[in-house]
């Protein structure tokens, strides 16, 4: 959250004075709001790498690594780690408020039922070298998902936004399936189908490590640890990946491409 300060900053250009408001963040950070600079003066600011520029107003997360502070939507990470789960925190990050139980149950059910990918996507893995970087494979496969859901990836902003809830849940679900398949491809192992009777992280570990002779269903300790790890990394403020996604999505790209 931010608020406008009564203070203003004056910039003098070509013998003309221009005043700009000061914005104060919830943690006391101060910024100059120069959004009207070009319209007023014809000038723009140059700040290579955005080292001194806030790219947007955000209410999603706050990080102060030096002081060990992390908040998602205003909730301290310690509180979420003790009382929440990754999927509940993901819902919180996306929609701004902790969901009621019925809403959370519906969201979790949608995620659980969306883990499988079309069998024809299995053949995509034949085109990757065994030494290909996992992130290159993951990004390629996620982008390919859009071709299987044309109604969600039309690049028509209004149409794609009307499917946002379903698309977001689908991607949260399938990213673990694709990650597990990528790992097993690189290890030369057969793919393992998802089991929607398991938890989000339990199913991911199952798809990663189960074998025909060993079904890893009882691994609550590892599953809970992984859930906590994902919860901690649910959002990371305005880092490179977030900024890139914001830039791509602002052009109207669908959620799969973003």
Name what the model sees in each region.
Residues 2-258:
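Hydrophobic alpha-helical bundle cores within soluble ligand-binding/oligomerization subdomains
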């Amino acid at each position: 959250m931010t608020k406008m300060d009564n203070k203003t900053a004056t910039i003098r250009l070509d013998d003309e004075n221009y005043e700009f408001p000061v914005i104060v963040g919830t943690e006391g950070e101060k910024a100059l709001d120069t959004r009207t600079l070009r319209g007023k003066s014809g000038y723009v600011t140059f700040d290579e790498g955005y080292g001194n520029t806030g790219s947007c107003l955000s209410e999603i997360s706050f990080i102060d690594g030096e002081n060990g502070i992390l908040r998602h939507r205003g909730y301290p990470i310690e509180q979420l780690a003790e009382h929440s789960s990754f999927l509940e925190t993901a819902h919180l990050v996306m929609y701004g408020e902790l969901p009621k139980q019925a809403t959370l149950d519906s969201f979790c059910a949608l995620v659980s039922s969306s883990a499988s990918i079309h069998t024809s996507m299995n053949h995509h893995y034949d085109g990757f070298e065994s030494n290909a970087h996992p992130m290159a494979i993951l990004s390629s496969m996620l982008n390919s998902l859009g071709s299987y859901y044309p109604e969600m990836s039309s690049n028509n902003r209004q149409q794609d936004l009307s499917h946002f809830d379903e698309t977001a849940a689908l991607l949260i679900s399938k990213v673990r399936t694709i990650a597990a398949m990528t790992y097993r491809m690189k290890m030369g192992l057969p793919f393992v189908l998802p089991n929607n009777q398991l938890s989000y992280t339990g199913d991911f570990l199952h798809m990663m490590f189960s074998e025909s002779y060993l079904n890893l269903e009882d691994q609550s300790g590892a599953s809970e640890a992984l859930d906590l790890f994902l919860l901690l990394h649910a959002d990371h403020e305005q880092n490179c990946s977030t900024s890139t996604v914001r830039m791509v999505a602002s052009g109207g790209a669908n959620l799969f491409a973003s």
